């Protein structure tokens, strides 16, 4: 049976274990035995919070994040290396790359986008929830051709005051320039959070993209901590 792997990347200051209940919202039989991983970011000083130390995948110079907010690309690229190591391990264990899905909220969404677009193989998809583009367009030339074939699902609440809706919309011209397919879904009235409606759509989106058997095998019950 085909194996499916779902990697979920949390937001700034959050943790992997706190996000594990999300898995229970995915109730379809096609994903009943999917392998999930909810890693926790390391503790780092964060510029937008006056240098306070918290779980953070990379440095964030400014929040709320809006169109034109400064970014720290070098910090993002370091975080991407660690996500790629997890994906590499999963593929080495036999998972079809096109059954590997990366999902992330806020800062985790930005890291999801970066990790997918810089990975040398086509993955099943990247789901960005209330995230942003953590790059300037100068990096587009570094995207592998296979990575550009990975579909992106972008979900964003119109009332988001932490990562402004307009910052999410700015992903569309960026991805178009890169030649990447993106489905953008706006959620009217939703702030900087996740809704059950979003999760249900992500579930159906993943199901439509599964390769091979509709069933999955390999259950990972352990939680791995990244970057330690």
UniProtKB/Swiss-Prot annotation:
InterPro entries linked: AB_hydrolase_fold, LYPA1-2/EST-like, PLipase/COase/thioEstase
Pfam families: Abhydrolase_2 (PF02230)
Disruption phenotype: No visible phenotype under normal growth conditions, but mutant plants show hypersensitive response to infection with the bacterial pathogen Xanthomonas campestris pv. vesicatoria containing the type III effector protein AvrBsT.
EC class: hydrolase
Keyword tags: Fatty acid metabolism, Hydrolase, Lipid metabolism, Plant defense
Outcome recorded upon mutating residue 106 to A: Loss of catalytic activity
Coiled coil: none
SUPFAM superfamilies in the cross-refs: alpha/beta-Hydrolases (SSF53474)
Any one Gene Ontology molecular-function term assigned to this protein's record: carboxylic ester hydrolase activity
Active-site residues, record numbering mapped to chain: 106 (charge relay system), 160 (charge relay system), 192 (charge relay system)
Mutation effect (residue 192 to A): Loss of catalytic activity
Domain of life of the source: Eukaryota
Biological process per Gene Ontology, one example term: defense response to other organism
Known EC number: 3.1.1.-
Stated family: Belongs to the AB hydrolase superfamily. AB hydrolase 2 family.
Function summary: Possesses carboxylesterase activity in vitro with a preference for short acyl chain substrates. Functions as a negative regulator of the hypersensitive response (HR) triggered by the bacterial type III effector protein AvrBsT. Possesses phospholipase A2 (PLA2) activity and hydrolyzes phosphatidylcholine (PC), a lipid that is hydrolyzed by phospholipase D (PLD) to produce phosphatidic acid (PA). Required to suppress AvrBsT-dependent HR and PLD-dependent production of PA in response to AvrBsT elicitation.
Protein name, as recorded: Carboxylesterase SOBER1
